[in-house]
Regions:
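The structured alpha-helical core of multi-pass membrane proteins
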Residues: 1-448
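Short "domain-exit" segments at the C-terminal end of structured domains
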Residues: 449-453
Length: 453
């Protein structure tokens, strides 16, 4: 069975700087960060809502915020942006890129600091692979399957949850929730032929506006209760587990919602490049998310009764309805990250010989990684619409969503260990220590998700 393409560490965007880099960063905000950017809508709410959550007491609020702060920091800022995104397969990221790296017959050409444009490709057979590499290939393919599943579930649950917000205004909308969701999904997938660059140009400003609004909503509450920033101390997370024991472990099943979309950073690397994705995260997305999460915590310190919906509790009066409209747009945008990731995943699978040839349309003359795959696009659309028609409620999809996310991230961590040890020549202790930090946390969240079924 054909399997292999030799990897390269050269990005697709080496020339991006100045205005070009800013444009790519804007597109990355719209395409890559839509999913993780809408997590404040429900992450804190699920953590302080019974039966799986905890009561909105001060000690619990500090603990929950600590559990949210450190996963975002360790998983996104450290794991993906500092370490994992340094490993690419000819500029592409994602679980198949890692699989291709670890399955190479020779490790001579790839190091962590390599910047040359090594474009050679080779293929190998199953008989030429060691058993360990065969197992890693199977693991990588399973991770790819989970990412495809995530690409189907994310648009369905995001758009469905947004349209369900219409029921808050009046129950008269209830019969129209599913039909409206299906129409929006069809329109979303019909837009894909514009390419991620064109879509990013449309979605980018919407998502930037979203991040500005959620930061502006949270900041006044932090100013009123600056003591909430103490939750950055990990001791509060430790105390939370000591206090709640087994139930605190279950809360991790809700905490994982704050990093949904994290794998999209890596899967979409070929569309925008590492520099643009990192710039967008550190200058816009990361600060806005933290301000909003800590703002929700400060709100709950003063008004525990707001636990029913702490996100919308941050705003009131004339600002409530604009926020509802913007949130609806943002959740629709959130679908894009995994759709784009599915295109990149498909191209890699075709190049490695695991999928038959498909039509791959390059939608940008400047950015090689920006592609559109019609066959995958329409298959995803049919699958998403089928999920909506079958489940009809976003809550029915939530558990499968969390399992797909944590499973993919855990597999990425394991494959990264072998890249670091075998290709980058890190010591087993160094690579193993990093794996322990990443995989231990992901395994706890995976188990808590399964126990909450």
């Amino acid at each position: 069975m054909p399997e292999q393409a030799v990897a390269s560490a050269s990005p697709h965007h080496p020339q991006a700087h100045g205005a070009g880099l800013a444009k790519l960063a804007l597109g990355a905000i719209g395409v890559v960060y839509g999913d993780i950017g809408t997590s404040p809508l429900y992450a804190v709410k699920e953590c302080v809502t019974l039966p799986h959550g905890v009561a909105p007491l001060a000690v619990n609020i500090y603990g929950v915020l600590s559990l949210i702060f450190w996963p975002i920091t360790l998983v996104v800022s450290v794991k993906y942006l500092i370490f994992v995104m340094r490993a690419d397969n000819d500029g592409e990221g994602g679980v198949l890129a890692l699989m291709a790296l670890v399955a190479r017959p020779s490790a001579a050409a790839v190091t962590a600091d390599e910047s040359g444009a090594h474009r050679a490709s080779t293929r190998t057979t199953w008989t030429g692979l060691r058993k360990t590499k065969m197992l890693l290939i199977v693991l990588g393919l399973f991770g790819a399957a989970l990412l495809y599943g995530d690409g189907v579930i994310t648009p369905a649950i995001s758009v469905l949850s947004a349209v369900e917000g219409l029921e808050v205004a009046t129950s008269a909308f209830s019969p129209f929730v599913v039909p409206i969701t299906c129409v929006i999904l069809v329109l979303l997938f019909a837009m894909q032929k514009r390419g991620t660059g064109g879509i990013g140009a449309v979605f980018g400003p919407v998502t930037v506006t979203w991040f500005v609004f959620i930061a502006a909503a949270g900041l006044p509450w932090i100013v009123r209760h600056p003591e909430i920033l103490r939750a950055m101390n990990p001791i509060y997370g430790a105390r939370f587990f000591i206090l709640h024991r087994g139930h605190g472990f279950l809360v991790l099943g809700s905490v994982v919602l704050c990093v949904t979309g994290g794998e999209a950073l890596y899967a979409d690397m070929g569309h925008f490049g590492t520099r643009a994705i990192r710039l967008a995260w550190y200058t816009c997305v990361f600060p806005a998310l933290l301000i909003n999460y800590f703002g929700q915590g400060a709100l709950l310190l003063e008004r525990p009764e707001a636990a029913a919906n702490p996100f919308y509790g941050l705003v009131s009066g004339a600002w409530l309805y604009p926020m509802v409209i913007l949130a609806t747009l943002a959740t629709v945008v959130a679908s894009q990250a995994l759709i784009s990731g599915a295109y990149s995943l498909t191209r890699q699978a075709v190049q490695l010989g695991y999928l038959p040839r498909v039509t791959i349309v390059h939608t940008s003359g400047q950015t090689e990684g920006q592609i559109y795959v019609p066959e995958v696009n329409w298959l995803l659309m049919v699958a998403c619409v089928a999920l909506v028609l079958g489940f009809r409620e976003s809550s029915a999809l939530a558990d499968a969503y969390g399992i797909a996310v944590t499973g993919t991230m855990a597999i990425t961590s394991m494959l990264f260990f072998f890249v670091a040890r075998d290709l980058w020549k890190w010591g087993a202790l160094r690579a193993g220590a990093l794996l322990a930090v990443f995989l231990c946390f992901r395994s706890e969240e995976q188990t808590s998700e399964l126990q909450s079924q």
